[in-house]
Amino acid sequence: MRHYEIVFLVHPDQSEQVPGMIERYTGILTQAGGQIHRLEDWGRRQLAYPIIELHKAHYVLLNVETTAEAVEELETAFRFNDAVLRSMVMRTKAAITEASPMAKAKDERDTRRSSEERAPRAEAAEEVEESAENTAE
């Protein structure tokens, strides 16, 4: 079996259907005896150039180890699904299991946002406590 990196872009109006699509496509690969090494749902992102007058798309990345027949079947499924705007399948030399730079950047943003949200809440809680102490005196 060979290692592949697969990226596909889904129409932004079909974003709710992406989990089902991922399940269906990973099922195609695993039924052929394949293994999913990495699965990343990057969500809606800006496109580098418009595709069918669309400026955003839902991105999904897969790193898999499977047979060439399963990859051909997956590419056929991409072709017949109108919601899939673009897809790319690249053969790689080894399995890639570490998080991609896109996923790392998203995780960093999420941790920054959550820490920024906690800080104002903590300050507001302190102010409420101080005002409660002042009114109690």
Swiss-Prot record:
Residues 96-137 are annotated as: Disordered. Residues 125-137 have a biased composition (Acidic residues). One of its GO terms (biological process) is translation. Keywords: Ribonucleoprotein, Ribosomal protein, RNA-binding, rRNA-binding. Pfam families: Ribosomal_S6 (PF01250). The gene is rpsF. One of its GO terms (molecular function) is small ribosomal subunit rRNA binding. GO terms for cellular component: cytosolic small ribosomal subunit. Residues 104-124 have a biased composition (Basic and acidic residues). This is Small ribosomal subunit protein bS6. It comes from Shewanella halifaxensis (strain HAW-EB4). Binds together with bS18 to 16S ribosomal RNA. Belongs to the bacterial ribosomal protein bS6 family. The lineage of its organism: Bacteria, Pseudomonadati, Pseudomonadota, Gammaproteobacteria, Alteromonadales. It comes from the Bacteria. The keyword Ribonucleoprotein applies.
